[in-house]
């Protein structure tokens, strides 16, 4: 599936400069400060959204399902420890690259299979469906190297987060049914239902459906760009990271 349609897709987003008031970097730094209101909750949301790429990376490194789960939890918990965040104040960089490098260092310097379970269990940041995660991993037909697989899973996680944000907006506006019908066309699915059939189901004209798809593609592009903006350190890096994501999911 092509997640980036050439018609009003992510690269054609009308958003100009993105706001950097709440990046993933700032979420980690705030979560490390006990006095920061909502910091830990924000970090939990970040973990929920981006834990799977790291889980899949660990599985590709040869760790078992339970080892990968425990190591993943423990790694994120370690990011909340103040003494591990001293070097995070920086002016640029991709959060994707930081997380992977930090996990690699975590595995090399502090953890082995024998100690994984001792600290990982019982420190769940948020409840996760680990059975679903393992099923998802086993269903992936690709035999990518761990680092390549991580970048691929990260790209799809960013895309899915933007799509969920769009769904939430439409649900709040009472347009969830419209979203359900138009979603395949937002992601460039060539096997999506014809506009005429969608129009008949929704009681709209075919022209109105086309306008709806165009507008939702624009909004999807905005939300995707905003999500990418939260994972980089400067506005100059947004376009480059978007291009990188497009290349990854198109490979």
Model-derived features with residue positions:
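Intrinsic, short, N-terminal disordered tails of RNA polymerase sigma-factor systems
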Residues: 1-251
